[in-house]
From Swiss-Prot:
Organism from which the protein derives: Actinobacillus succinogenes (strain ATCC 55618 / DSM 22257 / CCUG 43843 / 130Z)
Primary localisation category: cytoplasm
Lineage of source species: Bacteria, Pseudomonadati, Pseudomonadota, Gammaproteobacteria, Pasteurellales
Gene Ontology molecular function: any one: acetyl-CoA carboxylase activity
Known function: Component of the acetyl coenzyme A carboxylase (ACC) complex. First, biotin carboxylase catalyzes the carboxylation of biotin on its carrier protein (BCCP) and then the CO(2) group is transferred by the carboxyltransferase to acetyl-CoA to form malonyl-CoA.
Superkingdom field: Bacteria
Pathway(s) this gene product operates in, as recorded in its UniProt entry: Lipid metabolism; malonyl-CoA biosynthesis; malonyl-CoA from acetyl-CoA: step 1/1
Membrane spanning residue stretches: none
A single BP term in Gene Ontology: fatty acid biosynthetic process
Keywords assigned by UniProt, alphabetized: ATP-binding, Cytoplasm, Fatty acid biosynthesis, Fatty acid metabolism, Lipid biosynthesis, Lipid metabolism, Nucleotide-binding, Transferase
Localization per record: Cytoplasm
Protein name, per record: Acetyl-coenzyme A carboxylase carboxyl transferase subunit alpha
EC id: 2.1.3.15
UniProt catalytic activity: N(6)-carboxybiotinyl-L-lysyl-[protein] + acetyl-CoA = N(6)-biotinyl-L-lysyl-[protein] + malonyl-CoA
C-alpha cells in the first residue's frame, strides 16, 4: 500500500521522497555509497515527524482519524485475533457489509468481535457503504452480542464510522429503532463489553456498538455527535469553519479522557496507526487483555451495576 500524506505532513513527505530517491540511486550503482546521507535525512525526518505530531490540533486529528491508509476492523482482527470465523446476516432482512463480526480467539480465549468496516478501493467503499451501517447491520451486531451472552463470551467492538446510514430505505426499515434497541440491550448484557474507537466515532452510528464496561480510543481517533463539517454548516452556515468547529467540539481522545467519557487512550506509532499496523495492533491487544483481566473478577451483578453507574455519570448536573 502506497503511503499517503495529509497537507500538514507535506514537509515530511518531501524528506521521505528524497530518502527513497537516494536509496534508488545507491541501489542502482554499487560504487556510490549514500548511507550517511540517507541516515542524516532519516534522522531529520523522524525529528520533523515528532515535532509535527506533538502539536496536532483537533481538526488535524479529525483528518488523521479518516486517513485512507488507517487500519480498519478487519486489519485489527487479522493482527490481534486467531481463528476468526465471520458470522453474517441479521436473520430478518440482509447482511450489511458495513458491520463485520464473528467468533475469534484473543490469546487463546474465545471472544465475540464486532466492528464497523470501511473500504479502500472504490468497489470496497461501495460494498461497505463507506462504513455507514443500515438497520440490518446493527441488528446483525445485536444478534452476535446476544449469541455471545448465551455462550458467556466477552464482546469486543471496534468503532469506525462517520455515522449510521441516513438513506430513505434505512429510515423505512427502522434505523432509529435499531440503534435505540442496541443501546438498551448493550446496557444489560451479562458479559464483559469492551469498546474501542479506532477511527471516526460518529454520532448514534458509533454509540450503537459503543455501550460497554470499558471504552477506549486510539490516540488519533475522534468521537462526537456530528462531524466538524456538519457542525460548522449548522452553526456558521459554512463547512469552511470545520477547523473552528473541531476545536470547540472536544472530539479528541485527550479531551474526552479529561471529561471521563472514555477510560484509556491507546498510543499510536509515530506518524499514526497507518505507519505501522503491527505496532498499533500490539498496543491495542495489550489494552484489551488488561481490560479483560480487570473485568473478569466481577460477577454479573457487579458488572451490570458498574456499567449502570458509568452511564449515569455522563453529562453535567
Amino acid at each position: 500500500m502506497s503511503q499517503e500524506y495529509l497537507d500538514f505532513e507535506l514537509p515530511i513527505a518531501e524528506l521521505e521522497a528524497k530518502i527513497e530517491s537516494l536509496r534508488a540511486v545507491s541501489g542502482d550503482d554499487n560504487e556510490i555509497n549514500l548511507d550517511d546521507e540517507i541516515k542524516r535525512l532519516q534522522k531529520k525526518s523522524e525529528e520533523l515527524t515528532k515535532k509535527t505530531f506533538a502539536n496536532l490540533d483537533a481538526w488535524q486529528i479529525s483528518r488523521m482519524a479518516r486517513h485512507p491508509n488507517r487500519p480498519y476492523t478487519l486489519d485489527y482482527i487479522q493482527h490481534i485475533f486467531t481463528e476468526f470465523e465471520e458470522l453474517a446476516g441479521d436473520r430478518a432482512f440482509a447482511d450489511d457489509k458495513a458491520i463485520v463480526g464473528g467468533l475469534a480467539r484473543l490469546d487463546g480465549r474465545p471472544v465475540m468481535v464486532i466492528g464497523h468496516q470501511k473500504g479502500r478501493t472504490t468497489k470496497e467503499k461501495v460494498l461497505r457503504n463507506f462504513g455507514m451501517p443500515a438497520p440490518e447491520g446493527y441488528r446483525k451486531a445485536l444478534r452476535l452480542m446476544e449469541m455471545a451472552e448465551r455462550f458467556k463470551l466477552p464482546i469486543i467492538t471496534f468503532i469506525d464510522t462517520p455515522g449510521a446510514y441516513p438513506g430513505v430505505g434505512a429510515e423505512e426499515r427502522g434505523q432509529a429503532e435499531a440503534i435505540a434497541r442496541n443501546l438498551r440491550e448493550m446496557s444489560t448484557l451479562s458479559v464483559p463489553v469492551i469498546c474501542t474507537v479506532i477511527g471516526e466515532g460518529g454520532s448514534g452510528g458509533a454509540l450503537a456498538i459503543g455501550v460497554g464496561d470499558k471504552v477506549n480510543m486510539l490516540q488519533y481517533s475522534t468521537y462526537s455527535v456530528i462531524s466538524p463539517e456538519g457542525c460548522a454548516s449548522i452553526l456558521w452556515k459554512s463547512a469552511e469553519k470545520a477547523s473552528t468547529a473541531a476545536e470547540v467540539m472536544g472530539l479528541t481522545a485527550e479531551r474526552l479522557k479529561e471529561l471521563d467519557l472514555i477510560d484509556n487512550i491507546v498510543t499510536e506509532p509515530l506518524g499514526g496507526a497507518h505507519r505501522n499496523y503491527a505496532e498499533t495492533a500490539q498496543n491495542l491487544k495489550a489494552r484489551l487483555l488488561t481490560d479483560l483481566e480487570d473485568l473478569d473478577v466481577l460477577d454479573k451483578d457487579d458488572l451490570l451495576d458498574r456499567r449502570y453507574q458509568r452511564l449515569m455519570s455522563y453529562g453535567y448536573c
